[in-house]
Amino acid sequence: MTHDWQPDFEQLVEEHQSMVFSLALRMTGDRGLAEEIAQDVFMEMDRHLGKLESAAHATFWLRRVAMNRSADALRRRRVRRVDLWVEIEEQHGLRAETAARPLGASMGARLEALLATLPEAQRAALVLRYQEDLTPEEIASTLAAPVATVKSHLQRGLKLLRARAASHLKEYVRERSSRDSRLMGGVSSDGRV
């Protein structure tokens, strides 16, 4: 098949490196692993550069490979019986860190931590929908899944994310009230002892 588009490797890397890294980071929750995945994706793209037919095809291909490599990395971790979420909390101190900061100051970090707790398929669908602004049909194509399955993952993922966010917010309010009470020497906010 002949086509007029001539891919430029450096230009494609420049244009898409942040997208590929961001997808890998949101899927794995691990910055170092996301960097490795992004590097692997671009090395593979270099080997398949002649097969890319257009700029849109290159973007689609990069998203698909980034999502697949991220899923592979998560599966390898599971096989080694490493609980990724506990590891993330231990490495990055998410629980202690989020409890110590004001709610609004770290909303992005809190959302990232909650997103990381979702099942892989739901997390993938949400990341592609809300980070990449893809339609359910485009997500289905990227993940090689039926559209109905993608819509289900989106619906269930949002429902689970909302439930976990509500629970997290209640826990934050409870911790904050307890801390404020201790700081006030046992005096409640309405002045009662």
What spans do the regions from the language model cover?
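C-terminal flanking helix
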Residues: 21, 42, 119, 123, ...
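Structural recognition of an alpha-helix C-terminal capping motif at a helix-to-coil junction
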Residues: 22, 36-43, 56-68
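DNA-recognition helix of helix-turn-helix
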Residues: 67, 71, 143-170
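Internal acidic/polar
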Residues: 2, 80-108, 113, 135, ...
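Arg/Lys-rich amphipathic alpha helix in sigma70-family domain 2
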Residues: 53, 64-85, 104, 156
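A short, charge-rich alpha-helical start-of-domain segment used by transcription regulators
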Residues: 1-22, 32-38, 46
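Sigma70-family region 2
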Residues: 2-3, 39-57, 76-78
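A short pre-motif secondary-structure segment
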Residues: 125-129
